[in-house]
Amino acid sequence: MNLILLEPQDFVAENEVVLTGRRLAHVLSVHQAAVGDSLRVGELNGLMGTGLITQLDADQLRLQVNLTEVPPPKHPVILVLALPRPKMLKRILQMVATLGVEQLVLVNSYRVEKSFWQSPWLSEVAIREQLLLGLEQARDTVLPTVTLAQRFKPFVEDDLPGLLLGRQAWLAHPLDASECPANMSGPQLVVIGPEGGFIPYEVALLQSVGLQTVSLGSRILRVETAVAVALGKLLPLA
């Protein structure tokens, strides 16, 4: 937890917050802080700054906060990802938030197991929890947008063209693929398939709306590794 995220209900006055639960436990056990110490804090979807500890005990943490810093800008990248298995989804959500991706779309595919869509990890609360962990790691306050698309063909034909406007668009797939570009600075969209990849029909449909196939290398990667490699290549170094 490199940043303590503050939510509206934490504020007891304009510049004062009271924290309990996980954040209190982290400050006690990891930071081992004391009254008079300062901690890095940020208001969710707002400014960042410091929090001066004015009270700290087993029941609560009270901070006087000074929020003056703008959070780091999001990368103008949309990741369209075939819904992975739930345990992998948790890690990918954290990664997306940590790396500053603007938007994540979780989409269905022929090789996505139907049971994945009934997972409790797809609830709004569960998704938000993992995104918060990613923001805490990166020292960011702004949540990425996450949307679900349970029907592949309607998403590609009706929704995807609008997302592609003004963006370079890539499909991570080895068929007739060029090398994945690196350190891109403009708006982009990248599509990554499920374990086993998209079926030929899905690849053709994605190509028909303007996606260019790119290769992430000769090795067969797990989905979360493919996400890390693709974003690592596409996002600018600075």
Residue locations for each model-derived region?
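Hydrophobic side chains in well-ordered alpha-helices
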Residues: V27, L89-I92, E202
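RNA substrate-binding interface of SAM-dependent RNA methyltransferases
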Residues: V70-Q168
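Short secondary-structure boundary segments
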Residues: E43, N108-S109, H173-D176, P194, ...
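Short, ordered loop/turn segments at secondary-structure junctions
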Residues: Q9, T68, N108-R111, S218
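Active-site/ligand-binding-proximal alpha/beta "capping" segment
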Residues: L160-V203, L211-V214
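N-terminal positively charged helical leader segments and presequences
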Residues: M1-E69
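Structured adenosyl-cofactor binding patch, chiefly the S-adenosyl-L-methionine
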Residues: P200-A238
